[in-house]
Amino acid sequence: MPMSDEPDPYIADVTALTVNALKTAASEPSVKRVVLTSSSMAAVNPAPDVPRTVTPSTWNNEVVEEAWSPSSNADRTMTIYGASKMSAEKRAWEWMEENSPAFALNSVLPNTNFGPAVDKRHAFSSTDAMLKSAYDGLADDMDSDPPRKVQL
């Protein structure tokens, strides 16, 4: 996650590091496939109860525009994160097309991951904060996110 609400240099750095990983993989003949962990924000912004179709050619240009917009909201951390994931993944696929390496690229787009905090001092500064909000009865903090359940 970005440690600033400024998109530069975070978005460019994430994109460059992603391409660098692909270049490194291409230089090693034993690499058969690369899996890029992207984000659902690379394809779409979270929008509760808004039906839509997502395809391999769906890109969240909206999040990139919002990240670079001076009129964006004050806390742009998630917006910048989403823009970095979209920019990096899109550039990765462009790089694959331009360079035709010997390996296959696959991309996964999870929406939210929960697990133990790597750094206990910052345990509630990321997605774990959503769990704490729900535990503390502040579930309204998550109203802007779509439901993470399936009714059977």
Language model features: what each stretch is:
Residues M1-L17:
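NAD(P)H-binding glycine-rich loop region in Rossmannoid oxidoreductase-like domains
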Residues S4-D5, N45-D49, V118-K120:
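Short, solvent-exposed loop/turn and secondary-structure capping segments
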Residues S27, E62-L105:
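Active-site Tyr-X1-5-Lys
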Residues S39-D75:
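Active-site "gating" loop of Rossmann-like NAD(P)-dependent oxidoreductase/epimerase domains
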Residues P29-R33:
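A short helix->loop->beta-strand "cap" motif at the edges of active sites that frequently abuts
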Residues N99-Q151:
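NAD(P)-dependent short-chain dehydrogenase/reductase
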